[in-house]
């Protein structure tokens, strides 16, 4: 019960930091634009939903490893990640280019 409560609280913390990034920072949503941001070395942190296809996930993780960028696996599915971003569509992966006022890059562990 305690672990579940702690996981829920950290999940809410990620969501609030992500909402701050959406308001004040720069980001790219989607598989193709995430790969483009990794190839151009603009991405600082990558978030991948839990139900992202394994081939896409491994390709994003490979490009992130080459660019030395942290990858965080979001605990929710793509609908949850889209809702956390404040969008009305599904988001399987996103790249944070500029965190803005948020401290999400410092607080999230890179490889989880």
From Swiss-Prot:
The lineage of its organism: Eukaryota, Viridiplantae, Streptophyta, Embryophyta, Tracheophyta. InterPro entries: Ribosomal_eL30, Ribosomal_eL30-like, Ribosomal_eL30-like_sf, Ribosomal_eL30_CS, Ribosomal_eL8/eL30/eS12/Gad45. Pfam families: Ribosomal_L7Ae. One of its GO terms (biological process) is response to fungus. Keywords: Ribonucleoprotein, Ribosomal protein. It comes from the Eukaryota. Belongs to the eukaryotic ribosomal protein eL30 family. GO terms for cellular component: cytosol; cytosolic large ribosomal subunit; cytosolic ribosome; plasma membrane; plasmodesma. This is Large ribosomal subunit protein eL30x. One of its GO terms (molecular function) is structural constituent of ribosome. The keyword Ribosomal protein applies. The keyword Ribonucleoprotein applies. The gene is RPL30C.
